[in-house]
Amino acid sequence: MKKAKKEKKEKIIKPDGPINFNRSIMAAFEKQSRGKICPLCETKFSLASYKSHMNTCNVADDDEEIEVIATYTRDEAILMRAGPEIILGDASFSDKSENPTKRRKTDEREVPSEDDIVPEVPGPSGIVKNHEMPSESLDVTEISENIEKVIKKSPEWINHRRRSSRLLQNSQKDQADNANKEDPVKKETATISEVLQAIERFEQRVSGPEQTWPYYIKITIKIMKRVISTEKFDGTFYADDFWLPSDIITFYRFVELLSEGAKCLLVRLFIRKPAWYNLEKLEQKYPEIPNIKEAVSELAKGHFIDDDSSMKTLDEALQISDVVALKNVTKKFKLDGTKNRQELIQSLRKFAQSQQSIFGGTGNVEKSILKSLKQELGPCVRVRGGFVDLFKCLFTIYCPVTTNSANVIDNPSTTNVYQDLLYLMLSVANGTVQFPAPNPCPIIASFYKNRNMLQDYMISKSLEIAIVSQMSNGNLDAALDLAIDAKEFIEQMSDDDKRYYESLEIHERKFTSIWVFTRCCGHASSILERQKKYGMAVEWQKDLLITNKDIQSYCIDSRGIWWDRMLLNLDSHLKEKKECAKMIQIALQDPSILEKELLMIQDRALKLKEMPADFVTPINIGNPEKKTITANVITKSLGDGRINRFMIRDHETDDDVECSVEEVTRRHYLENEGFSTGVHDEGSTWHTLFGLFFYDVIFATDESVESTWLSELQDCPSDLSNTLYSKRKEKFEDRFVWLEEAEQELIEENIRKIWDLKHNETNRECSWKQFPMGAEDCVSFFQCIPRPALILILRRLAENYRNSRSGFPDLTLWNPETKRVAVVEVKGPGDRLSTKQRLWLAIFADSGIRAEVCHVAAQNSRLLV
């Protein structure tokens, strides 16, 4: 058996017969020795040297038998035989990964003509994608010209300058002439100087009275001009060395090359939520845009937008599909179409995931549904993320205060910052809105040394907005993951950048990436508390407050809140009383803690038995005066979250009407306490007096505070917080001396003067509507306040604005005849005084002004919840 296997193996290895001589190695040696004769110089060469000789051999100049039409190297001849090149154009918008560069059978990569390539407009990341377009039929001359372009750029052309025929010379001359006539559409590079020249030409075109360009186009270009032409603090500009080359060419193309319709559509898409939009609906929504289909084609060709060929996922299509399209698609796949939109989306999504192909995947089913949805939707477009990011950078540099992501936290209803900014600029241009900021503003935000710093700040803002959005939607795990990303950004930040950010003034640090990332870490502790992971929350809070030295100089306004939350977690949730007492003693040494948080920490310390016996309270305030009144209440829930509804009698109609608890109290004091005027202002009347007396100090625009005005749209200087007093100390003190010594009539005249000059202006301090009778109403209020009390209150605002800008009592009441004034904090059922309110009530009481807490109880016998 073994012998048979061995014979079988030998049979397989053994050759079938004798080797043919032509296939033998001897035949190869003989072929090499014979060589080959050159047909041009008739010289014999070995096969090894024949090919290289043919690349250099020329016909003699006096040869009468041969006329050379054109000469090519071997590689050039291969390109000739390959046919016309594949031209990369603008008709396709798919990514390189989906249309890879093709190769010939010779494995030579096709080289596209430079003049036929329109490069992608990259985003801030600088990533450029090429897109492939099917080539059209070319005649012989075009083929020859295309190949000549390739030859001219090849190494062989440079190293071996062959004699050209007249045909080739003429072709090169035509190519040079065409190059001298630059096609602006194919312009691939630009400078900031060229962008400014293009802006000047645009301004000349739209300056005529017959021009009707939309305001948002003119304002967008105005923003661009101001950003790239305004001098920074250090004397430099946002010039060519700051921007990427792709950024500058995008600016140039937007201003110079795009048509009016394309500009309008692009800006409209930019200021809207970045998503897919149906072209038909865009036509209906923006009828003022001329030839919107041509605009779409132009923008797609210029790589500013994507068409629906870039819509790759089912979720993208489902998100923009209306009920009609969804029903038609569900009917096509034999699903139940008698549902609402959300149910139809879920049904299609579930169907796509449940139907497996023969290979076990669901991709083919999803693609079929996606294809059907695209057919139903028709043409769709989406502005490219790179363009959106770049223009957000422009708007951020122009007005960092308005585009600050902290505004989303303070006002969650703020959904479209950039659209609001454009409309606000229109209002300023029309004169319907006035701000105290200089217009035009001579200074621009200068916190970003390079493009990467600006990009990091943009990332941090987007990250914070995403965290807040996920938290509001209840997606706490996703929000926590984003907060962890923020912490990693801080850890990976270079030491040079950290030192630079720390060298900035406090009001400038707010517009840097490390400040926003630090605030995102604060969101993480809030998320963990909502998830009842108190131990992890404490670890994050300790890192923010104690451990991580790199972030101690940021989010100073929030440090007191973080201390209070950490102590609450240790005391109430984790029951670690000793650790809480230890942390309290560390917290009291933190100079950045505001007075209101300090009082909260003090209250907790007084309740802890573990605190040392010699503990000294840092703040000593008395208890405010209390008053209790009753009012009629209807306990009824109408779906708005309120249960207790206060009712009062309207004397004009003799009907019972619903009102707020503050209105109940205000009426009580006007009818029963001897006051003739009262407003529910929460301190705005006092802030108005502060703004009137110190207007030229707070809103000064001289060189010493010039860096606090970064845009024409600011309603206050950017340092109306920590450094307000320190930067203007001398001027504040001079004004306080004047208030102490000036005659009553002179001060009243000053109030009237400032009121007449500025009452149409919108600024952070003055609430003109609180005095409906104008300046005289304000003067009558001033006459009721004792001068020493007024100076004490205004000094507290000036010296510690960050600590005292809020917390004022709800009601301010006065009587010009009796010269009496009072402040009242109103508390309904179940309400408690905050530490800010306790502090202000104590300040008013100490200054001699009547300050009370008024509790409103139910008229009926039922206790209110």
UniProtKB/Swiss-Prot annotation:
EC number: 3.1.4.1
Basic and acidic residues compositional bias, start-end: 93-112, 174-187
GO molecular function: 5'-3' exonuclease activity; 5'-flap endonuclease activity; flap-structured DNA binding; phosphodiesterase I activity; zinc ion binding
Keywords, ordered alphabetically: DNA damage, DNA repair, Hydrolase, Magnesium, Manganese, Metal-binding, Nuclease, Nucleus, Zinc, Zinc-finger
Residue ranges covered by zinc fingers (UBZ4-type): 35-62
Disruption phenotype: No visible phenotype in normal conditions. Strong increase of embryonic lethality following cisplatin, nitrogen mustard or mitomycin-C (MMC) treatment.
Subcellular location, record wording: Nucleus
Major localization class: nucleus
Record protein name field: Fanconi-associated nuclease 1 homolog
